[in-house]
Amino acid sequence: MRRRTFIKMSALCAAVAAASALTACGGDKSTSTAASSAASSTAAGAAEGDFGGRTVTVGIWGGNDQETAAINKLKENFEADHNCKVELKVYTDYNTQIQADFIGKTAPDVFYIDASMFPFYSSLGVMDVLDPEEYSLGEFYPNLVEAFTDADGNVQCVPKDASTLATYYNIDLLESVGFTAEDIPGDYAEYKAFLTDLQARLDEKYGPNQIAAMTYNQDLSRNLYILQDGTDGLIDAEGKPVLTGDRVVSNMDFILDLVHAGVWKTPSDLGLGWNGEAFGTGKTVIMEEGNWVYGTLKVDYSDIHFGVKEMPVYNGTQYSMSYTVGYGIYAMSQNKDMASAWIKYVTSVDGLTIWCSGAGCLPPRADAAKAMDVESDPVWAVHSAMTACSLPWQLGSNLSIINTAYQNYLP
């Protein structure tokens, strides 16, 4: 699906001096957690899983009330099952603060890593290599595991959740101009003709530029699968952007064609902040959005009659984007046995059911999705179906630079 490329530190993160300090404190990342567990344990002779009142520190970023309740439930269960304490270290500026902790050699035993940042942190050597069999990674969606696999094929994080894009449509607005959900094409090749017709009908009924046929995000995190289709990726082996190849330009032209035709508009074009607001206020008929918008629509825009369908095919391939976060183990942790046990629990079917049900995200493994009965909710069912074919949001260590270049290219 894509070529994995990693490079050393770039302007995305800290200065060269900080990177050197981080690399120096990272230790040998070839040391597996399984091999180092015995050395890190101070509970000799204790029963398996009994950590004798020790404390494991878990680095996370803050969330909403539902996420806080879910992580606290996991904490409570783990403490009860393992006779230990879990200290949740909540960062308010995650990437800045945890890098400072790496430099100071005070990082948590186990911590969140966003897939978009994994190439950077992997290059620093601050995480242990994990044994796929030990963490049951065969049960996880392969594309999500790949997002946390380094250039040498070593897995360094276990996915803890995911979100995907799907196509949302306003049923009432469609029907008001003579369309139904079945008329929305399943192939991007048919989008321009359909959206042009839809926009013309909307303008005739509601007035010019009152309601958009479709909104999109001017961001690679949403459009990467289109630009990257049929290529070896948007970065070369050295991590430099490759945005001028014929296929990339052709894919870019496809997006520009929809924008120039006036059938793809950004929420800001409508004077609004994001897709959810544009859709919820009835200012757009169709949007491609992540499952996080579902709660917003149910709570803040409950009068909107909407449906959800899979993302359209592009050049014969079914795509979506996914946004995943994993747990990594600090290479210098003195509690690797506890960190490992924490990951195994929170990424088990039981742990994921607690976390994903509470936090409103998708489980990274199919058996957990089945246990959660995501198929019983038509919205969650579509988003879950998109997981296996999704492209995780990740683009080497120069992600922000490449994304800015892309945004500057679009009108």
Report each predicted region and the residues it spans.
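Short, low-complexity disordered leader/linker segments with a strong preference
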Residues: 1-57, 367
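Hinge/lid segment of periplasmic solute-binding proteins
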Residues: 40-50, 114-166, 192, 207, ...
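Extracytoplasmic/periplasmic solute-binding protein
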Residues: 44-46, 156-160, 165, 190-241, ...
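Conserved C-terminal helix/tail region of periplasmic/extracytoplasmic solute-binding proteins
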Residues: 55, 175, 181, 200, ...
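Extracytoplasmic/periplasmic substrate-binding proteins
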Residues: 61, 111, 118, 221-222, ...
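Extracytoplasmic "Venus flytrap"/periplasmic binding protein-like
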Residues: 73-143, 172-178, 183-186, 278, ...
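Long, aromatic- and glycine/proline-rich binding clefts that accommodate carbohydrate-like moieties
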Residues: 146-148, 302, 306-309, 357-408
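Glycine-centered hinge/linker elements that transmit conformational signals in sensory
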Residues: 194-197, 239-268
